[in-house]
């Protein structure tokens, strides 16, 4: 894995026996450019970019073994590492939360840019795939992102039956919570450092 710093962004390249990924995460564009090859995953990523205000350019996203689980998990790893490299958690608000309705679904997201990776959600999906994406990919992506960004993320589903609506409500709330957590702040952690 290689990391290259830019003025307003970070390029991460990850090449394993299973996948090849090259992405750029920036603070400028606020949208997804390019494709992972998984339409619904692209939809969720674009949703995250729109509501977080972050830009994501996918230059390369190829599966060498044809297993979507690996592709989506490694994409989360790459994006999480880019996020950690791009931001100094000691100079931002750190905490963010948002609750977003989408039709019958209502999901809240609670974020701490703590340096301590932890992911939790209180819901499971009722189908095996949403459009062309295996539902296990949602958690695999989030775990990859959280572990390498070194942040804490909780999702709480208040209501929801339609898995498309639930996942999109979750990703919108995640984007908004991240945007809030990244607001500039002079308030320091009581510990004095974020590892």
UniProtKB/Swiss-Prot annotation:
Do you know which Gene3D superfamilies this protein is assigned to?
A: Imidazole glycerol phosphate dehydratase, domain 1
Q: Which GO terms describe its cellular component?
A: cytoplasm
Q: Where, subcellularly, is it found?
A: Cytoplasm
Q: Which residues form the signal peptide?
A: none
Question: What domain of life is recorded for the organism?
Answer: Bacteria
Indicate whether Cytoplasm appears among the record's keywords.
yes
Q: Which PROSITE patterns match?
A: IGP_DEHYDRATASE_2
* Family membership noted in the UniProt record: Belongs to the imidazoleglycerol-phosphate dehydratase family.
From the Swiss-Prot or TrEMBL record, give the protein name.
Imidazoleglycerol-phosphate dehydratase
Organism per entry: Thermotoga maritima (strain ATCC 43589 / DSM 3109 / JCM 10099 / NBRC 100826 / MSB8)
């Amino acid at each position: 894995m290689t990391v290259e710093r830019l003025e307003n962004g970070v390029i991460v390249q990850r090449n394993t026996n299973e996948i090849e990924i090259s992405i750029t995460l920036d603070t400028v564009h606020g949208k997804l450019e390019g494709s992972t090859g998984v339409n619904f995953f692209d939809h969720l990523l674009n949703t995250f970019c729109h509501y977080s205000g972050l830009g994501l350019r996918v230059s390369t996203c190829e599966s060498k073994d044809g297993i979507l689980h690996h592709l989506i998990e490694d994409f989360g790893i790459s994006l999480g590492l880019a996020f950690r490299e791009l931001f100094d958690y000691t100079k931002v608000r750190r905490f963010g939360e948002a609750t977003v309705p989408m039709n019958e679904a209502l999901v809240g997201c609670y974020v701490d840019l703590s340096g301590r990776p932890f992911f939790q959600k209180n819901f499971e999906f009722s189908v095996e795939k949403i459009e062309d994406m295996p539902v296990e990919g949602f958690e695999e992506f989030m775990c990859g992102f959280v572990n390498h960004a070194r942040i804490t993320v909780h999702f709480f589903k208040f209501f929801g039956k339609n898995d498309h609506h639930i996942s999109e409500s979750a990703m919108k709330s995640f984007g908004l919570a991240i945007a809030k957590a990244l607001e500039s702040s002079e308030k320091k952690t009581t510990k004095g450092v974020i590892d």
